[in-house]
Amino acid sequence: MKPFLRSQLARHAQRLGELDFLLARPDIMADMVQYRSIAREHAEVTQVAGRYARYLQREADLGAARELLADPGMAELAQEEIDSSQTELRQLEDELQRLLLPKEPDDARNAFVEIRAGTGGDESALFAGDLTRMYTRYAARRGWQVQVLSENPAELGGYKEIVLRIDGEQVYGTLKFESGGHRVQRVPATETQGRVHTSACTVAVMPEPDPARAIALNPAELRIDTFRASGAGGQHINKTDSAVRVVHLPTGIVAECQDGRSQHGNKARALQVLQARLQEKERSERAAKEAALRKGLIGSGERSDRIRTYNFPQGRLTDHRIQLTLYQLQQLLDGELDPMLQALGHAREAEQLQELERG
């Protein structure tokens, strides 16, 4: 095991004793907010300490087995114990590395997914529709619930813009690396010469706001408009002005919702999206400052970051951040995203481990 890992694990063992002491204090027990916070940390540290205790035990077993190799009568059994211990030690070290990685507080939250057509006109809008279908199908595979909060359908199909709310377990943590520019290369149905056209969409994945960290909104800095909700083809969903658009005047950030029939409900959801966009703006500004100090493997998640190319003639999808190419484009577009998302997750873990090692 690397020395920096052993040092980190020793600190966890020490911290466990400190937490045991804190949880026994009457003043801590009387403050339920503080008690729950310490109890959560205690559960996390206990898991790490327990696995590290197992690692130390198997390390001792390995040492004892090596001493028995010199005994002809025990050599075969000793070698079996050595092989078994080494295999488990490798597994435990990998597990401990993952447990030591910093937790992303928003990973467990629901998410808003915003897809916008970019360069490429009608073809870009059609591709926005393809991406919407891809994420919707992936959500169905995961048992997540998808709600369309707002949509601006294009005349020839697809969307100029669409905002989804996805509700489920670890939604943001799973989809957060989808933020950025998505480029498509294919022959449009209207192309008579068979030429490949390139167009693009942008995707923004934002965690549903945590009420405890909500940004204070001054009502005087909000403009709230109501309008009649309409779907694709201009068909009115209802005949009342139930759709709501909220503009944050200081930043110009806009959020709208037209999904529900209730103006009150649409306003509440639009304000949620606005909160998410304001928090995302703050996150992006922090990421830009951090990027000046180091270049992250996964990228900042900015819309300007071109993260992926979908090449239809070659049937391939390439993620430029981790230089991964998969020749299973149709399966991925049908919602089988796990091979790509898992590779991105592993890349992020490797990046975090390097940061941990650097201290």
Swiss-Prot record:
One MF term in the entry's GO annotations: translation release factor activity, codon specific
Annotated positions of the N5-methylglutamine modification: Q235
UniProt main location, coarse: cytoplasm
Gene3D superfamilies per the UniProt record, alphabetical: 3.30.160.20, 3.30.70.1660, 6.10.140.1950
Keywords, in A-Z order: Cytoplasm, Methylation, Protein biosynthesis
Compartment annotation: Cytoplasm
InterPro entries (UniProt xref): PCRF, Pep_chain_release_fac_I, Pep_chain_release_fac_I_sf, Prokaryotic/Mito_RF, RF-1
SMART domains in UniProt: PCRF (SM00937)
Record PTM: Methylated by PrmC. Methylation increases the termination efficiency of RF1.
Gene Ontology CC: cytoplasm
PANTHER family given in the database record: LD18447P
Family assignment from sequence similarity: Belongs to the prokaryotic/mitochondrial release factor family.
HAMAP family in UniProt: Rel_fac_1 (MF_00093)
Role of this protein: Peptide chain release factor 1 directs the termination of translation in response to the peptide chain termination codons UAG and UAA.
Name the UniProt record assigns to this protein: Peptide chain release factor 1
Organism: Verminephrobacter eiseniae (strain EF01-2)
